[in-house]
């Protein structure tokens, strides 16, 4: 019934108010850890990249990001750290694209609309993952539009966006 749905929605909102910062910190720490793992796997598989100073610098930034999110006092601070780490990750992303039959070139992240084939693939994969998460969240009774990291915005499944953060880099491994 609608009344029960409203109760669940209220519980979700109350939970995110009470522990949203901790959820954001844990989500972003996991995102940075997973991103570091993807980079290390790429380095393991591509010996010629292991001594690349820019890649090593980004690994350090992501490591520091894990520590820094737990020092953050607001979700906005956490998201600022996430933005800084993402910007640095995407600064080396082109070097991480290996073993392709078709030459891909990536300079920087663009969205709405993506301006090159790599950005189009990123946006497509992220959209698929976000839609899958939104469906799963709705199935278990959560409101996918009410998240803890991403601000509420008309039409955005903020909770699904929050959940996808942790696995974004993993969703690209086999593409």
Region annotations inferred by a language model:
Residues 2-8, 175:
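Short, small-residue-biased leader/transition segments that mark boundaries at the very start
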Residues 10-172:
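Active-site helix-to-loop segments that bind/position phosphate- or nucleotide-bearing substrates
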């Amino acid at each position: 019934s609608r009344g029960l749905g409203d109760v669940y929605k209220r519980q979700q909102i109350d939970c995110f108010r009470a522990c949203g910062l901790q959820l954001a910190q844990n989500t972003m720490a996991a995102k940075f850890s997973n991103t570091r793992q993807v980079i290390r796997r790429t380095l393991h598989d591509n010996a010629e990249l292991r001594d690349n100073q820019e890649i090593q610098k980004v690994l350090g930034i992501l490591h520091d990001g894990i520590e820094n999110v737990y020092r953050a006092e607001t979700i906005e601070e956490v998201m600022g750290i996430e933005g800084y780490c993402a910007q640095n990750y995407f600064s080396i992303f082109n070097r991480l694209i290996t073993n392709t039959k078709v030459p891909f070139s990536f300079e920087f992240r663009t969205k709405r609309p993506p301006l090159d084939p790599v950005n189009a693939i990123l946006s497509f994969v992220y959209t698929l993952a976000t839609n899958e998460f939104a469906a799963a969240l709705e199935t278990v009774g959560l409101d996918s539009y009410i998240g803890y990291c991403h601000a509420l915005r008309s039409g955005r499944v903020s909770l699904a966006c929050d959940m996808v953060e942790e696995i974004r880099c993993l969703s690209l491994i086999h593409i």
